[in-house]
Amino acid sequence: KKAVKPYLRQFLSDTRVIEPPPPRWIWKIILNAVILNLRPKKSAKAYQTVWNTHGEGSPLLSIAKYQKAEITSQLEKRAPAQFEVALGMCYGNPSMKSALAELESKGCKKIIVLPLYPQYAASSTGSVFDAVAKELLTWRNVPDLRFIRSYNEEDKYIDSLANSVKDYQNVYGKPDFLLMSYHGIPKRYFDKGDNYPCQCCKTTFRLAQKLDLKPDEYQMSFQSRLGFAEWMKEYTDQTLKALPSKGMKNVQVICPGFSADCLETIEEISEENKGYFMESGGEKFGYIPALNDRPDHIEFLTQLLLDNTYGWNN
């Protein structure tokens, strides 16, 4: 609980993540007086269920370290002694500050920032941009900087997703229905111009096309809503509760917007939402893991980085 509280304070204080209507001080009171006194205990219990499931400690951090190691290895093979790779997170550690300080100490003059969010959203990728910009404000010599905004339309990303589905189904069989669940955003963010849901639609359509799915064999949904405001629909939990009554009793779920498994996939989808589905009459539920450190995923990310060095001589 003590470890979760500072993380939640940092996360929920990010105005990219939570855009409270003015006056903002009302949200600060709610956050500090209510949420930070209730939420940490619940979140801590959830984290206990996923701790050490993918190595030591947080699954997200463990997988991110694997990804970093594999990408570093691939870059070294393809361009020896040309790249340094650092891992940074917007909230918690290793921080964005420590990652950029590491690159600065190694004399890096050209930096590519790759947020591991396939679909751009102001509340995710936008926060990464803000964190990087904040740290670079302190640099005397600002580096050449390239920022990869999104990669949801890259063919190799779609191929990796399709391969992960096929690999899973080769072991567990095909379901009646495939649900593609993405992290949700409040509808008013979309109304203000955030095209994240449109990118999710494109990913869903292309993946379904790659898997040769019929329209009645798949659906897109959004998870992790918070509070009482309307979020982008359809909601994942409500969708899973309704599927058995429609004859879909063997369901598999994939979360294409997560490059690494974390609390929201392992606990929220494969445990909590599985429970909703089974309690509603479902018979078989499968969660298809995130791309994590799959070789085809690492190969794609490595090539994406190399492609974004175009025009840099050294």
Which sequence ranges carry the predicted segments?
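Active-site-proximal alpha-helix that buttresses catalytic centers in soluble enzyme cores
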Residues: 1-314
